[in-house]
């Protein structure tokens, strides 16, 4: 029975064709004309770029200082090994944002993901994945691998500048592909409901790396899309109040003790004798007032002026509401 001309059809049939544990086709129909591409493109973009997952982000290989090198007894160069590590499919227990796993292998033959040692919080989904090949019985390789939780794709170059100071020599960064979705495509076919033949049928064909089932991936992508669209349901001007940073009443340097100025013992003792304990106390004094201080001569005065000037301060400054409550309570 036909509904109102202004009423939108909602999909009534969802068919899931499970081709393998990592490959599935999901069919959604009927959709109003044009909605197949609207929803298909939105879901495709989210599945490719916004799905959370786990990936290798760093690796330390024994005897290797940088990625542009080779290791004796290993067929692949280091860059190729890093590329192979990107293909490692890892599932990490919820609540863990990063874990470390290790690999120690010796003897001729392939080194695979199944050779990796890990605890119960980690699962290697593709244990047959080849990492490298050892070329002799005396060859060996040892590495420590960092796996992190993230979203989308984060190239190593994006983390070089932020981690350069803390990263020791020999710790190699890896381009991180966090998304568990390997391939995603959609097509729109014709659908029919009673006498209407201008409707859409959306078919989503996708493959994952095994850490997430295709059906669950689509469900999560749809949830992300729905949450983002919620903001458009009610377009009243509801603004999230910006948190205003409270500016300190006084420059922090004024709250520091005069000992931080590292004056000579003579000058420091003279100031303490006059109950000048903080830099804020000092800058409010004039040259004339300081020269009246017992045992503080012109040499000490010059020293004080120079030290204050080096910090952008001077004598004779006026500070409203000094001292602050935190100092007054002391």
Curated annotation (Swiss-Prot):
Pfam families (UniProt xref): RNA_pol_A_bac (PF01000), RNA_pol_A_CTD (PF03118), RNA_pol_L (PF01193)
Keyword tags: DNA-directed RNA polymerase, Nucleotidyltransferase, Transcription, Transferase
Catalytic reaction(s) noted: RNA(n) + a ribonucleoside 5'-triphosphate = RNA(n+1) + diphosphate
Biological processes per GO annotation: DNA-templated transcription
Enzyme Commission number(s): 2.7.7.6
UniProt region (Alpha N-terminal domain (alpha-NTD)), positions on chain: 1-236
Enzyme class: transferase
Domain of life assignment: Bacteria
UniProt keyword Transferase present: yes
SMART domains linked to this entry: RPOLD
GO molecular function: DNA binding; DNA-directed RNA polymerase activity; protein dimerization activity
A cellular-component GO term for this protein: DNA-directed RNA polymerase complex
Segments for region (Alpha C-terminal domain (alpha-CTD)): 250-330
Domain characteristics, as noted in the entry: The N-terminal domain is essential for RNAP assembly and basal transcription, whereas the C-terminal domain is involved in interaction with transcriptional regulators and with upstream promoter elements.
Assembly, per entry: Homodimer. The RNAP catalytic core consists of 2 alpha, 1 beta, 1 beta' and 1 omega subunit. When a sigma factor is associated with the core the holoenzyme is formed, which can initiate transcription.
Function description: DNA-dependent RNA polymerase catalyzes the transcription of DNA into RNA using the four ribonucleoside triphosphates as substrates.
Record-stated family: Belongs to the RNA polymerase alpha chain family.
Protein name in the entry: DNA-directed RNA polymerase subunit alpha
Organism, as annotated: Vibrio cholerae serotype O1 (strain ATCC 39315 / El Tor Inaba N16961)
Record gene name: rpoA
């Amino acid at each position: 029975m036909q509904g109102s001309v202004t009423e939108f059809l909602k999909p009534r049939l969802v068919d899931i064709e499970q081709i393998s544990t990592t490959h599935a086709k999901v069919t959604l129909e009927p959709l109003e004309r044009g909605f197949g591409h609207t929803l298909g493109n939105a879901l495709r973009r989210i599945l490719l770029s916004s799905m959370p997952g786990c990936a290798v982000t760093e690796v330390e290989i024994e005897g290797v200082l940088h990625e542009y090198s080779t290791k004796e007894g290993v067929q692949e160069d280091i860059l190729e090994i890093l590329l192979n590590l990107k293909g490692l499919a890892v599932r990490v227990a919820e609540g863990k944002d990063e874990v470390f796993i290790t690999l120690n292998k010796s003897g001729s033959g392939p080194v695979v993901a199944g050779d990796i040692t890990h605890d119960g919080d980690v699962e290697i989904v593709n244990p047959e994945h080849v990492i490298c090949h050892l070329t002799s019985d005396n060859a060996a390789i040892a590495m420590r691998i960092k796996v992190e939780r993230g979203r989308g794709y984060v190239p190593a170059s994006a983390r070089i500048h932020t981690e350069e100071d803390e990263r020791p020599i020999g710790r190699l960064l890896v381009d991180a592909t966090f998304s568990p979705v390997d391939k995603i495509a959609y097509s729109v076919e014709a659908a029919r409901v009673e006498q209407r033949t201008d409707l859409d049928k959306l078919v989503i064909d996708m493959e994952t790396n095994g850490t997430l089932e295709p059906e669950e991936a689509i469900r999560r992508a749809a949830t992300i899309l729905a949450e983002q669209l919620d903001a458009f349901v009610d377009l009243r001007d509801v603004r999230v109040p910006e948190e205003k940073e409270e500016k300190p009443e006084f420059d922090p340097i004024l709250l520091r003790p005069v000992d931080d100025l590292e004056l000579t013992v003579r000058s420091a003792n003279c100031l303490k004798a006059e109950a000048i304990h903080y830099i804020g106390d000092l800058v409010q004094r004039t040259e004339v007032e300081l020269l009246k201080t017992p045992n503080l001569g012109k040499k000490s005065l010059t020293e004080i002026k120079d030290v204050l000037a080096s910090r952008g301060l001077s004598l004779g400054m006026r500070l409203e509401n000094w001292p602050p409550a935190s100092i007054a309570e002391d």
